[in-house]
Amino acid sequence: MIPWLAGRPDFPPVEQALEDPDGLLAAGGELSPAWLLAAYRRGIFPWYTEDQPILWWSPDPRLVLIPAHLRISRSLRRTLRQQRFEVRFDTAFADVIAACAEPREPGGGTWISPEIRQAYLRLHELGYAHSVESWVDGTLVGGLYGIALGRAFFGESMFSRRSDASKVALVHLAAHLQRLGFAAIDCQMTTAHLLSLGAEEMPRARFCAGLANWTNEGPGPGRWSCEKAAEISRNFS
């Protein structure tokens, strides 16, 4: 059994999360900014389908990408040099999260419900949630979004409508975070794709101990400048 949360965001210790399914910690609560920010600071995130209550997770181990450790293949470096995409920060957050919410397969479902979308749009308005966008001729063709707290970035989802569009966005994110002194990008669940890009598994205890410091250091909330994205692009040309 897992606890049912209500009232204040008083999450149980992450050590109480289930092993099967890995990381399931609690149910209930809200998707308000106070709840979401309290969760992320503790290494907890929401993930559930539309027919479920809000479920809170903290898997062990945790997949983490150190910004400086991102692996860029030769073909991706060539794409970056050729400037095939214009990369922007925080100009189309609603469009990015809507694209991420589209089912990956015809008839498939999505965990990014309208409720989730509204919650993260609110965090974007408050300066905590950010989008990194890849554009071609004024059309959004890829990107990602996530939460920035102190020196930690919590990646949520990405999408791509053209080859390398989301990878280019990730490269710009990592470069931007490295400039700002961020310690880590939380990738949440382990996937072969993210491992190939340089992400590594970190014991949950170590990850959460890091968060206790990272989320209380570094820059505060606020919009990211598109000029910073343009500077990063020029460095690859």
UniProtKB/Swiss-Prot annotation:
The keyword Transferase applies. InterPro entries: Acyl_CoA_acyltransferase, Leu/Phe-tRNA_Trfase, Leu/Phe-tRNA_Trfase_C, Leu/Phe-tRNA_Trfase_N. GO terms for cellular component: cytoplasm. The keyword Oxidoreductase does not apply. SUPFAM superfamilies: Acyl-CoA N-acyltransferases (Nat). One of its GO terms (biological process) is protein catabolic process. GO terms for molecular function: leucyl-tRNA--protein transferase activity. Keywords: Acyltransferase, Cytoplasm, Transferase. Its EC number is 2.3.2.6. It catalyses: N-terminal L-lysyl-[protein] + L-leucyl-tRNA(Leu) = N-terminal L-leucyl-L-lysyl-[protein] + tRNA(Leu) + H(+); N-terminal L-arginyl-[protein] + L-leucyl-tRNA(Leu) = N-terminal L-leucyl-L-arginyl-[protein] + tRNA(Leu) + H(+); L-phenylalanyl-tRNA(Phe) + an N-terminal L-alpha-aminoacyl-[protein] = an N-terminal L-phenylalanyl-L-alpha-aminoacyl-[protein] + tRNA(Phe). Belongs to the L/F-transferase family. HAMAP family: Leu_Phe_trans. NCBIfam families: aat. This is Leucyl/phenylalanyl-tRNA--protein transferase. The gene is aat.
